[in-house]
Amino acid sequence: MRCKKKLKIVWVDAEHLEPESERANPAAYHKAWHDVCTASGILVPGGFGQRGTEGMMKAAKWARENGTPYLGICLGMQIAVIEFARNVCNIPVPVSTSQEFDARDEDRIIISMPEHHPGQLGGTMRLGLRPTLWQPDSEWSRLRALYASTTSADGQSQILERHRHRYEVNPNYVSTLESKGLNFIGKDETGVRQEIIELKDHPWFVGVQYHPEYLSRVLHPSKPYLGFIAASAGMLDTITAEIVKEKTANTSF
């Protein structure tokens, strides 16, 4: 509604993007890739399990390399991080994967959180409304420009979003990923847990660990989704300017 566009959603089975599908079902494989290659934007949502994740990574790689707007939610953010680790940082498999997919070793790009004990899935998720602090020198962020941030106790700009996940980016690899251009622009209060990724020189390549849809409303759309749709429609600058103008008007005296 905010963008005044009619949204057309094309569902793609990520398994059909994988090489095995080309051999087993060529028609499904080529249709899936046609849908990805002709999409105005690519969204990889949250989820659990390994099924289809290699195909999701291929879709994320396509978006990253071809300037197609990308939004990764929860697992979708982790997929983008793994793809970047493999294809840009050249971190080998199995390190460049998730403990959710391969738990034989703790040295993984995506690891289980201290709150989560492998093998005990009940009641172990990181849930609820939690702060995400914008990191220094992230003022360039397209996503940040859309948010009306509050200020934390130490004066740092922050947002509040709801979470639902068991796995997170391994902090030991953050510096390596950032050195190649993957920016971790939002973190939790400790600075250890990674909440938001964004590529600077891309029309819109954003991943968030939280679930912004939980707080989205018809007249107050979630900023990650709003930015993604606006970028896909070629009107991100217009929407951002409107948001900035509204924020300025609301803070004027």
Spans of features found by a protein language model:
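N-terminal beta1-alpha1 cap of cysteine-dependent amidohydrolase-like domains
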Residues: 1-203, 209-253
